Amino acid sequence: MLEQEQASYRVERINELIRRELTLLLRTSIKDPRLRDMIITDVLISRDLSSAKVFYTVIKEDKKMIEPLLDKASGFFRIHLSKTIDLRHTPVLRFIFDSAPNTGARIEQLLSKL
């Protein structure tokens, strides 16, 4: 049981580290202004650390415009992560739009009208 808890803790720590590094990268190194309005909401790495789902939301831009940009930049993100995070293999990143923040804002807007 202890080994499983340690493995789970390690995965959570890596998730947070990847989220933090990608957020920093978006704020400091990405020149495309459309990607600067993006927020990384969560990262879920697989147990074998080979792939990671990166959940994001956007403030101003249309998500359909952002998805191809993220797919194109995923190699750049992986290279950066390989230099900053000490892992045997850098995970393959898959970006997934997170609609939860938008849904929450819509619910708040509807409740304020009551």
UniProtKB/Swiss-Prot annotation:
Q: Keyword Cytoplasm: yes or no?
A: yes
Which keywords describe this protein according to UniProt?
Answer: Cytoplasm, Ribosome biogenesis
Q: Name one GO molecular function term.
A: ribosomal small subunit binding
| Superkingdom field | Bacteria
Q: Where are the transmembrane segments?
A: none
One GO cellular component term: cytosol
SUPFAM superfamilies (alphabetical): Ribosome-binding factor A, RbfA (SSF89919)
- Subcellular location, principal: cytoplasm
Report if keyword Kinase is assigned: no
A single Gene Ontology biological process assigned to it is: maturation of SSU-rRNA
Please state where this protein is localized.
Cytoplasm
PROSITE patterns, A to Z: RBFA
By its UniProt entry, which NCBIfam families does this protein fall under?
rbfA (TIGR00082)
Instruction: Describe its assembly.
Output: Monomer. Binds 30S ribosomal subunits, but not 50S ribosomal subunits or 70S ribosomes.
Q: Its biological function?
A: One of several proteins that assist in the late maturation steps of the functional core of the 30S ribosomal subunit. Associates with free 30S ribosomal subunits (but not with 30S subunits that are part of 70S ribosomes or polysomes). Required for efficient processing of 16S rRNA. May interact with the 5'-terminal helix region of 16S rRNA.
Record's HAMAP family?
RbfA (MF_00003)
Entry's family note: Belongs to the RbfA family.
| Protein name per Swiss-Prot or TrEMBL | Ribosome-binding factor A
Origin organism is: Vesicomyosocius okutanii subsp. Calyptogena okutanii (strain HA)
Name of encoding gene: rbfA
